[in-house]
Amino acid sequence: MIPICPVVSFTYVPSRLGEDAKMATGNYFGFTHSGAAAAAAAAQYSQQPASGVAYSHPTTVASYTVHQAPVAAHTVTAAYAPAAATVAVARPAPVAVAAAATAAAYGGYPTAHTATDYGYTQRQQEAPPPPPPATTQNYQDSYSYVRSTAPAVAYDSKQYYQQPTATAAAVAAAAQPQPSVAETYYQTAPKAGYSQGATQYTQAQQTRQVTAIKPATPSPATTTFSIYPVSSTVQPVAAAATVVPSYTQSATYSTTAVTYSGTSYSGYEAAVYSAASSYYQQQQQQQKQAAAAAAAAAATAAWTGTTFTKKAPFQNKQLKPKQPPKPPQIHYCDVCKISCAGPQTYKEHLEGQKHKKKEAALKASQNASSSNNSTRGTQNQLRCELCDVSCTGADAYAAHIRGAKHQKVVKLHTKLGKPIPSTEPNVVSQATSSTAVSASKPTASPSSIAANNCTVNTSSIATSSMKGLTTTGNSSLNSTSNTKVSAVPTNMAAKKTSTPKINFVGGNKLQSTGNKTEDIKGTECVKSTPVTSAVQIPEVKQDTVSEPVTPASLAVLQSDVQPVGHDYVEEVRNDEGKVIRFHCKLCECSFNDPNAKEMHLKGRRHRLQYKKKVNPDLQVEVKPSIRARKIQEEKMRKQMQREEYWRRREEEERWRMEMRRYEEDMYWRRMEEEQHHWDDRRRMPDGGYPHGPPGPLGLLGVRPGMPPQPQGPAPLRRPDSSDDRYVMTKHATIYPTEEELQAVQKIVSITERALKLVSDSLSEHEKNKNKEGDDKKEGSKDRALKGVLRVGVLAKGLLLRGDRNVNLVLLCSEKPSKTLLSRIAENLPKQLAVISPEKYDIKCAVSEAAIILNSCVEPKMQVTITLTSPIIREENMREGDVTSGMVKDPPDVLDRQKCLDALAALRHAKWFQARANGLQSCVIIIRILRDLCQRVPTWSDFPSWAMELLVEKAISSASSPQSPGDALRRVFECISSGIILKGSPGLLDPCEKDPFDTLATMTDQQREDITSSAQFALRLLAFRQIHKVLGMDPLPQMSQRFNIHNNRKRRRDSDGVDGFEAEGKKDKKDYDNF
């Protein structure tokens, strides 16, 4: 005797391919089982593991027994494959069996095991099985030659399970394995599949054993099959692994009431009502199916090859199935009038905000109707009973009937088989009977939801629900409830609502249905309670209406908007003369709360209607819509993104400039190395190359073993191209910092604005003064101060790091005088205080014809404001007696030469911006030379304007754009040639009409010293010591790469050159290091 272990059994799991082959060889299936059918069947069960039917080795002596949870259930019979459990837990694996055309296959059970048995998780299927019978039969194939000692199974004598045609039964029977060589007894054993713990279902009622089955063809596989009765309903059962609903059989249909007990659901609440519906249907069908039991049992025995004989309780499974295809299960919500795709979606819908809001609105409607003893619609409202909505007029009702929502509800009700009310408009009346009907109709929805929802509930909830339904005392309530319950599936028979006979052991909480039932009870209690005083009515109404108030309505209520249109709100009274609601003629709406009335009169909708129909001058606030708010937020976000984009772009531009410089340095370094190589080739005594760069394409004379001549024209760069790196590095060190640039920009802009205010003040003063005199017209022609301009390094963009002095030129309409200078110096501090809170030190320098402005914060900047006038230069250029012109000057006129120099600075700045700013490398070289003039005393005597002219002429006269290194070398070459020496052509000033040498202020010694220094700098550049000219440390050379390059070339050249050539290369290396 091999005891049946309730916990787990060990099986050998072969591959699925071997299973199909063995089944096909041993005529296991009653029909041809092709590979395509197997694939289709395997695809039918998504939870199927890799292993197929559990097999035992033929040579194994020990007996293997498999207990598994059913995975797929057919309407014929449930053919299950045993799961393969090799260590501790058995995992289900369905046998892929093609079902008959008329038999709908159910989905598989995913495994969810406990420590001792198998559980069932939720499965989605087209038709639910009835609740499990008193026991389930467990068929076992074993190698033991004796009967197993498992306890027998007791079957209820009155419990019948339908089965479809014999063809479907044969398919299921064909899926069963043949017994072993020895006589194998198929016996029933209690299944622990519906239990969470180790407790099995026991039954103390009458016991019947299934007769032993004749021995058949030997099969080495040991399998266990559990046949679960399947009902032909379409109601799905969401069975979970940890739940066991407890069923109590009614005494009407069974001899003994058997109760299944187990642990409750922890997650799914959907199984109880479906099980209840199936159980009701099964009880109705049991009486009708007893007649065809014997014939169906005979057919089953014939198809299974007399494998085993079933007794009476199994004969009623052979009834014919429903011929039309079973429609898919539709989860319908009566409150929201929508359907859901599945139980999980329906459950999420019940927990959603939209459903809860409609549920609260339904509750409010019921409470209000119970309190007022009247409906809430307007006088002319037309009600659609199907959609449970009210329309304000015939046009609105006709539009609703034609609308998509109504048509969708009609289609759903047609599909569900529910009665569809007439589309004739139902005018809402104020009678008490209609109130009872309207109150009872939503009340029945929890019952229908309970039948449709597949939601687990407790027996107390069901009982309370029925109590709440009976308290109304309305006959139409029960009929509505019964109709909705029975009309869930189209092919489900009518059921008696004998709810107290079923004990529901389900989930811990049921939010939607429980709340609805409690709300119904509360509604009915309020309805049945007489109204003692009129004071209680507004309280109930206030509670009812205040729930759906939105924050926007509260904000409008709390605002300072005054209510308008009191005369257009009518009071609707009932037969007793009591105010039951208010009706607004403008908005065509009704409300039953005084607070809602005030809120409506202040609301934006009412005010818009009042403005449109009564008073167009009424100001209605523009409420930004969600779209407008989103557009504004999008604009702000895009603006921030744009600012961030430009900031990042500036940073990236700086980074690109640095990378470009680095790449250019790398490029010119490679070119320099190549150029050095060709220079060495030219220095060879027998090299065939002429002096200078390599010849054109295809030049002969390349010696064997030498690298080929570079193709194309000769590179334009000279050997000194590495100077660009030094020049750019030096330029980066002398360029002003960001803080210095910001400080310069700040003080210059503040000074310019302050001078503008000073000019306005002086102009006002002059106007007031001229109004008192006789020459008003003459004095009002020009302002005293015409404008301020930037000059010098500030206008040319030649600032260096550390420069603290910038120059401005203030143009005057008349010749500047000391009086005007003092007036400006006195008025400037007042205007500066208006513009900027910072303190500035202002000093009047009469000898310089300027005002000096110093900032008091770091970095301290100085602005020199020089006064001048174009009249001074015009008089100077005028032919005639100069003294006669000077007689007209005021006695305190400022220094004439200073004013002329300021005018010349204006011309120089204009010329520089037009000619030098756009020239490549010009500004960079001028900054380098300005730094050289500050560092080296010899160059300090070089006039800045002459240097700018020289650099511009040297770079612009080149045949091609010059790099910074080449431009610097070209400038030194020009100076070294003696262009600034006495007797040379010199540098004429292009901003003067008469010829004027810009080098006239330099002495001969200074000219010679600068020329000599330029020649020495040129020699340093030729010997790769430009860092000494620039006053910086040598930059780290890529000596490693350069040496590697030389070593590579030396290895190639050493094969075909003589010792002199190799010696020359060694000298070149030493020269480079030097």
UniProtKB/Swiss-Prot annotation:
Alphabetized UniProt keyword annotations: Acetylation, Chromosome, Cytoplasm, Developmental protein, DNA-binding, Isopeptide bond, Nucleus, Phosphoprotein, Repeat, RNA-binding, Ubl conjugation
One Pfam family of this chain: zf-met
Biased amino acid composition, Basic and acidic residues: 762-781, 1062-1074
Protein name (database record): Zinc finger RNA-binding protein
Positions where N6-acetyllysine occurs in the chain: K509, K516
Site of covalent link Glycyl lysine isopeptide (Lys-Gly) (interchain with G-Cter in SUMO2): K509, K541, K623
PANTHER family: ZINC FINGER RNA-BINDING PROTEIN (PTHR45762:SF21)
Biased composition (Low complexity): 362-374, 427-447
Species assigned in the record: Pongo abelii
Phosphoserine: residues carrying this PTM: S1054
